[in-house]
Amino acid sequence: MNDNNNEIDQLIYLFSKLPGLGSRSARRIVLYLLQDKDVRLKTLINNLTEIDKKIVKCQVCGNMDTENICGICTSEYRDKSVIAIVETVAELWAMERSGNFKGLYHVLGHNLSAASRQNPSILRLPELLDRCFKENIKEVIIATNSTLEGQTTAYFITEYLKDHPAKISRLASGIPIGGELDYLDEGTLSAAINLRQPFE
């Protein structure tokens, strides 16, 4: 690109920062949008504008929805005695795609890194403990990733919840060490949910 296309370069740069996209893929996407600007680009702009106006974080679990309390939290068909703890909304959506988990969720928003010595206060654990007592939770499924950070976070959560009587379990087989839930296929994730084990 040359200096006369600063806006295009900036758009390519922004797309290249999205997960899974490099500069070459970003360039192809921008070119695709610009080749039919009146339809493709304007449709994308309109959709992004609507999302910006309407999407909010669920005040209970941390999911993304159009309502302050999301459809999962308000559903009468969910098992409200079981709660899965996930690191981000991406993992929540992955578990929903599996179609195998019918309980509630709690999104931490972060994980803990032993190397960087992060403050555990970045996790939404006081809200989690409050929910466990108020909602009479019987089982807490720790569904953090199988990375070192995910394991560190899982152990910290277990210690934090030790005074609550709920059974604490962890997703089981099928998740490789270092694996992230969002990248697993639905079948593997379903097996991990069904074969979850007590956390020790």
Curated annotation (Swiss-Prot):
Protein keywords: DNA damage, DNA recombination, DNA repair, Metal-binding, Zinc, Zinc-finger
Instruction: Cite the Toprim domain residue spans from the record.
Output: 81-176
InterPro entries registered for this protein in UniProt:
DNA_Rcmb_RecR (IPR000093), Rcmb_RecR (IPR023627), Rcmb_RecR_Znf (IPR015967), TOPRIM_dom (IPR006171), TOPRIM_RecR (IPR034137)
Q: Name one GO biological process term.
A: DNA repair
A Pfam family of the record is: RecR_HhH
Coiled-coil annotated residue ranges, if any:
none
- GO MF annotation list: DNA binding; zinc ion binding
Zinc-finger ranges (C4-type): 58-73
Protein family according to the UniProt entry: Belongs to the RecR family.
Functional description taken from the UniProt entry: May play a role in DNA repair. It seems to be involved in an RecBC-independent recombinational process of DNA repair. It may act with RecF and RecO.
Name the record gives this protein = Recombination protein RecR
- Organism source for this protein? Rickettsia bellii (strain OSU 85-389)
Q: What is the lineage of its organism?
A: Bacteria, Pseudomonadati, Pseudomonadota, Alphaproteobacteria, Rickettsiales
